[in-house]
Structures are given as structure tokens and as C-alpha cells.
Amino acid sequence: MLEDLKRQVLEANLALPKHNLVTLTWGNVSAVDRERGVLVIKPSGVDYSVMTADDMVVVSLESGEVVEGHKKPSSDTPTHRLLYQAFPTIGGIVHTHSRHATIWAQAGQPIPATGTTHADYFYGTIPCTRKMTEAEINGEYEWETGNVIVETFEKQGIDAAQMPGVLVHSHGPFAWGKNAEDAVHNAIVLEEVAYMGIFCRQLAPQLPDMQQSLLDKHYLRKHGAKAYYGQ
């Protein structure tokens, strides 16, 4: 079942250590098949060096039950499920503890848009969620992690299609895209702009956000109705 999607998810997961987005097994990638109502995700605790397509786990999008697979799905599966349910345009999700994005998350700080590298992928400030409550932490923690992400987007009026990433306060980044490969691409860029942002803040602590017109130009020429840009 879903052999092609399993291979795509495997390759996307293997890209995480290749791009220095994970240490040990700290990360996961999934992809969704909305017609079948399932997602495919990395197994829990399996080293990337020995992971195979057969290790990928197929999970019901609605119930969270394992549909196919001989290993336990990632512990972050409930977060992935909730995000797929809340954001119907996304097809792949990545969660990492990449160093610089996690620094911003642990500081509880959003990443401001100060340059065109950021604007080419993220249409504005990359948000950081609020701290989770004691009830959320002690309850269905991974599910509530998804809820706090969705709450952040709803309260701030952010379109997940235009903002393919978020920082979870005190935790780390999630990124998404049209498929697993695209989600990894966005996670790579998120880590890069997080790195740039730290040094920008050190060099110019009062640095304002980039011009709105420049943000619009760079984002919309790649993603707008009249997109034309490509390198």
C-alpha cells in the first residue's frame, strides 16, 4: 500500500541529516494521501542510517490508528494529523530541532522578515506560538501542540499556504509544503533564515522589518497569481 508515498517520505526523512537539520533521531517527515484518508510518517526512534521504505508507517488521518506498518509511528504523529486536518492545502510536514530555529523557539521569539531570502518563502514574520498550558502539557500533549499552532495562525490571521512554517514556544520548528520534499525544502530555508536572523539582531538590535513593498515583490513574484521568478 502506498509504496511510492513511502519512498518519498523515506527520501525526505533521509534529507534531514544530509542538510544538518537533525541530531540523532530528533526529527520526522510525513506526507498525506487525502483521497485515502491516511498519512505516511517516519517510525519512532529508528536511526536514519538503517531506515528503509518498509519502516514507514501508514496512519489513519481521522483516528490515528496504524493502518499498515510493523513499527510504532513517530510520537509527533498527532501533531501532524491535526495540522493536515486544519490546513487542507498542505501535503507534507517536517518537524526538527534544527539548531538556530530552535534557539528562536526556546527564546519564544518570532523570526522577523528582514531580507529577501526570507521573503522568497515566508510572507511575513515567522510566528512563534504561546507557551502551552499545564493542562495542555499534561493532557494530549502532541495533539495540543498542533492546536496551539492552529490557534496562532487563526488569531494572527495567517494563511498556512503563505507561511509554511512556525516555531512552537520552548520546543522547535515545524514546516510544511505541497509534498514531503517541498516541506523539507521549506525547513531548510527556515533554519537558514533563523541563522541569518540571529546575526542580524546582533549587528543591528533595532533593525526594522524589511519594506512591505520589497516583501510583496519577492514573495508574490514566486508565489502570486502572476508569479514569474525562478533561479
Swiss-Prot record:
Q: How does it assemble?
A: Homotetramer.
Per the UniProt entry, the Enzyme Commission number(s) are: 5.1.3.4
Q: What is this protein called?
A: L-ribulose-5-phosphate 4-epimerase
State the NCBIfam families in the record.
araD, PRK08193.1, PRK12347.1, PRK12348.1
Question: Superkingdom of this entry's organism?
Answer: Bacteria
Species whose genome carries this gene: Salmonella typhimurium (strain LT2 / SGSC1412 / ATCC 700720)
Q: Which UniProt keywords apply?
A: Arabinose catabolism, Carbohydrate metabolism, Isomerase, Metal-binding, Zinc
* Record-linked SUPFAM superfamilies: AraD/HMP-PK domain-like (SSF53639)
Name of the gene this protein is made from: araD
- Molecular function, one GO term: zinc ion binding
Q: Which GO terms describe its cellular component?
A: cytosol
Kindly list the cofactors needed: Zn(2+)
Q: Which residues are recorded as binding Zn(2+)?
A: 76, 95, 97, 171
Q: What does this protein do?
A: Involved in the degradation of L-arabinose. Catalyzes the interconversion of L-ribulose 5-phosphate (LRu5P) and D-xylulose 5-phosphate (D-Xu5P) via a retroaldol/aldol mechanism (carbon-carbon bond cleavage analogous to a class II aldolase reaction).
Give me the segments passing through the membrane.
none
On cofactor binding, the record's note says: Binds 1 zinc ion per subunit.
The record places the active site at 120 (proton donor/acceptor), 229 (proton donor/acceptor)
Reaction(s) catalysed (UniProt annotation) = L-ribulose 5-phosphate = D-xylulose 5-phosphate
> Which Gene3D superfamilies would you find in this protein's record?
Class II aldolase/adducin N-terminal domain (3.40.225.10)
